[in-house]
Amino acid sequence: MSKIKKILIFGGSFDPVHKGHIDSCNSAIAKVDPDLTIIIPNKIPPLKSTLHASASARDRLNMCKLAFSNMGNLKISSFELRQASNAPSYTYKTIQYLLKKYPEAKLYLLVGYDRYCDFNKWKNYKYILNHVTLVVGIRNTNTLDLKDDKKSIPVLFPSVNISSAELRLKPNKEYMTEPVINYINENGLYAENHIRNLMSEYRFNHTLRVAKTAMQIARAVAPKKVKKAYIAGMYHDVAKEFNETT
């Protein structure tokens, strides 16, 4: 087995993972030419407004495995997801872990331009800068403004006009791979996001109670079918308030 000299690190919520993530990763790989790329779903992003991702850690990990399955020399790491519960994912800890695991490798960290601009807010950002080379994704050459004190490599990201929030409401084949969409549908991911927009608040609260009760019953009589019970409970009244124009 050849020695790993260059590692590209790509972390994020991946909630859900979409083609923008895949294309950005491919662009960075083409630029850096790493021996290994490591995709790292994070547990709780410190600089995001929400404390928890909508999908579970396990589901986001599984979606990443599906989305990046066709890419060679790539691993999906659960390192950050295995950290203490309710603790933010700090990149510097991941860097420390990877340096111990691959002591002879040079590390490259892929970040978006927005994250690059607030990089000084990252926990122990100076440590990170001393141990990795930043690979900064930009949407066009006019946005490039890399500081001289940061050893950074610009890479042009493809333009994907979609947000993860929109995809949580409605998965879209144009922006997501079919295996990921199938996984979302089969496992009832983002069901609450979806259902909330299809019914009144009264009906939605009723639906949540039914789903909770269905899960409680399933845990008692059919523990392996708890997720299916939840999905059935969430969607049992989905068409209740539909009319002829819905």
Show which residues each predicted segment covers:
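Nucleotidyltransferase catalytic core that binds NTPs
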Residues: 1-195
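Generic structural concept
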Residues: 92, 211, 232-235
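Active-site flanking loop/helix segments enriched in acidic
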Residues: 191-209, 241, 245-246
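Alpha-helical phosphate/pyrophosphate-handling elements in metalloenzyme active cores
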Residues: 200-228
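Histidine-centered divalent metal-coordination motifs
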Residues: 18-21, 206, 236
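Divalent metal-dependent catalytic cores for phosphoryl transfer on phosphate-bearing substrates
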Residues: 197, 219-246
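Acidic active-site catalytic centers that drive phospho-/nucleotidyl reactions
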Residues: 15, 114, 210, 236-237
